[in-house]
């Protein structure tokens, strides 16, 4: 796997222990974690998260591989993205992206997801990539549409999430569709 990945404005690379404080700061922000399953309670928890995801072996299917999104100009951590291969079907992967509030709305999420799709389809040989999104997360819905993913399913009140039943939108993209667009 080719990590780090360089895009026009980002370096996508493994998270390290020294990134924990910055990751904790934006991941514990209510505007960010409103739609996140993981809400870190401490910097120590974030350090454990980094140790548990950044170095996950490729063969550990089902586990998330998480990477930091760093501004190329300053090496500042401004978000993270990740994927996990499905244990029951290794040709598929789920993706996710988080961008710190001060960097949202500037196309960084698009840039990161496009790079992640390239990695998964071109280098990892995935057949299908998908994302699970709360339909109330309108920014994520718009992002996945912009990068060429389509809504494959809308599950109504299918997830118990933060004290309520939430809907779940599944966005998907096949390798042949990706190759036709890129």
Where in the sequence are the language-model features?
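Conserved acetyl-CoA-binding loop-helix of GNAT-fold acetyltransferases
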Residues: 105-119, 138-146
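Conserved G/P- and acidic residue-centered "switch" motifs that form tight phosphate/ATP-binding loops
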Residues: 75, 107, 137, 163
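Conserved GNAT acetyl-CoA-binding A-motif
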Residues: 123-132
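Conserved acetyl-CoA-binding loop of GNAT-fold acetyltransferases
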Residues: 145-155
